[in-house]
């Protein structure tokens, strides 16, 4: 049995790790998967830099965007205006639906609409995303569309947001 590391947190798995949230052995840094990684947020083995997938890397890799190689590192992506905006997509949004705007199915599912005059509809992820997109200024929409390799169809598949609406 390996020695107990008092700096380890419960979410670590593996042996001889320093840092937090590591899976694997002989890791220094945080949020690593694999073995013998130094740095943060690596998947793979023996990496000396951060945000790598693969093995034996000493510099940060460029990331794939829209299924194609880009000239952007993950660190650059994290610091980008586009990521900041995408992280603002609301979740768990509700909308008041008046009785006169309800379908027969909604009325059957929400009989209290007769007393309250409607019901609160919980919007799904794509509806929330589309509302977010509609609220963006043209300048902010262009920030999203300027993501390297931007592809509207792939963006829709991943976010549920149609950029042409």
At which residue positions do the language-model features occur?
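Short, glycine-biased loop/turn motifs at secondary-structure junctions and
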Residues: 1-165
């Amino acid at each position: 049995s390996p020695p107990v590391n008092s700096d380890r947190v419960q979410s670590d798995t593996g042996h001889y790790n320093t840092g937090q949230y590591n899976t694997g052995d002989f890791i220094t840094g945080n949020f690593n998967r694999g073995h013998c990684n130094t740095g943060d947020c690596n998947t793979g083995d023996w990496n000396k830099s951060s945000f790598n997938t693969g093995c034996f890397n000493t510099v940060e890799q460029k990331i794939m965007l829209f299924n194609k190689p880009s000239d952007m590192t993950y660190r650059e992506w994290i610091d980008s205006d586009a990521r900041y905006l995408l992280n603002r997509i609301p979740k768990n949004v509700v909308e008041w639906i008046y009785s006169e705007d309800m379908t027969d199915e909604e009325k059957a599912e929400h009989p209290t609409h007769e007393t309250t005059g409607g019901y609160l509809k919980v919007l799904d992820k794509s509806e929330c995303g589309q509302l977010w997109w509609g609220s963006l200024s043209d300048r902010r929409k262009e920030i999203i569309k300027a993501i390297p390799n931007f592809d509207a169809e792939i963006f829709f598949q991943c976010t549920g947001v149609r950029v042409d609406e």
